[in-house]
Amino acid sequence: MSSLFRQVLIVLVISTLIIVGINGMVFGAGVNPQIANISYWYADDDIRAVIKSRLGDSVYIAPALPNNAELIRDVAAAALLEAQAGKPALIPVNLNNSHWTGIAIRTKLDGNIIVFYNDSFGTSIGGASSQSGQYIEAIKKILPTAEIVDLRVHQQNDGSSCGAFTAENLIALAGLSQVNLTPEAARDLLANITDARTIRILQLGSLEAKIITAAEIIEGSIAGKYAEAVSEVAFSDMAN
């Protein structure tokens, strides 16, 4: 396991804990311990709980939908409105009830919308009849000026961790600095998120974490200690 990946995970934990602390919110989603099982396939509720535990109400999380063009158009429209209002809009996409991918919609400093899509297998956006393709087409129809970026970053090497990668990718893309919303920055970020077991343990840890207040964050040590603790558990588990 590279030290770079470890550092990326620690930075992600610290940054999202700071968001939680500053907002002063309590995110009490029930913990599903199965998400740490490498063979467990995430449900929509798991993905939403992981994202909400890290980002709270600072983002819009779209519901997972069946392959229904009208519903997809409605969610795409709602997501664009949220993004234009300043909230990162995150869309978990369930492809034929067999694979999760994700769409993150952000507003750049110049006010233009950029749409990131990634499939953790590294495959491209699907055709017009696929759910991913329908989302992208709906976004383009609603907002023709939107910049669509198909990241195609290959991360996943098993058959069960697409939900874990989708949740972590969406969290990472939501946290990408507004001054650095470029395809290159997004690809570089996701390229460091590659170990399914570590990601699952990180996500379970974030769901179980104690509430950390803004004052504790400012005092300095608690966020770092928690990030290190999660990281140590993850790497100890991988070594065994």
Language-model segments: which ranges?
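Hydrophobic core
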Residues: V13-G21
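Contiguous terminal or domain-adjacent regions
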Residues: N169-N240
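Cysteine protease catalytic domains with a Cys-His-Asp triad
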Residues: F27-G102, T107-F116
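Bacterial N-terminal signal peptides that target proteins for export
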Residues: S2-V11
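Cysteine protease-like catalytic core of ubiquitin/ubiquitin-like
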Residues: L80-N180
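Active-site-adjacent structural segments surrounding the nucleophilic cysteine of cysteine proteases
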Residues: I22-I38, L143-S160, G175, L202, ...
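Small-residue-rich hydrophobic membrane-insertion segments
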Residues: S2-S3, I19-V20, A29
